[in-house]
């Protein structure tokens, strides 16, 4: 039995994928989504990738994330926050970014899967869940 569990460890750790090199703020915006349907961003305008920004402060977003077991804040600086979300079963890691736009009074978002092509709407659901939690607080 132990041997079976240990043989699964390499597979489970590879589900995390490598941290992307192309995330962060570039020219005042979050990185564009790839063509694959496993990403949403408030900077995108097409139906598949576009999502509304959050009506909140970055501090409120951070408080919500700290209450989510699957979230791990990786970076928080100067109006930008990067968190990794790990799925419970397969341990897939997705990258979620938040960028404060003080002029517009919103938080721009980008949520993208590291692996695979389709996410079956997981990134959109995640952002909408965060939006709902922000409204409760």
PLM ranges: what are they?
Residues 1-12:
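Sec-dependent bacterial lipoprotein signal peptides
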Residues 15-137:
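Ser/Thr-rich, low-complexity intrinsically disordered terminal regions
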């Amino acid at each position: 039995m132990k041997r079976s569990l240990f043989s699964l460890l390499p597979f489970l750790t590879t589900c995390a994928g490598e941290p992307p090199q192309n995330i962060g703020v570039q020219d005042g915006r979050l990185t564009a989504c790839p063509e694959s349907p496993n990403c949403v961003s408030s900077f995108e305008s097409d139906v598949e990738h576009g999502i509304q920004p959050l009506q909140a402060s970055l501090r409120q977003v951070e408080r919500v994330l700290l209450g989510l077991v699957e979230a791990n804040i990786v970076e928080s600086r100067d109006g930008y926050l990067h968190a990794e979300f790990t799925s419970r079963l397969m341990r897939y890691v997705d990258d979620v970014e938040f960028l404060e736009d003080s002029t517009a009074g919103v938080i721009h978002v980008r949520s993208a899967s590291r692996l695979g092509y389709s996410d079956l709407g997981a990134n959109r659901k995640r952002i909408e869940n965060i939006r709902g939690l922000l409204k409760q607080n």
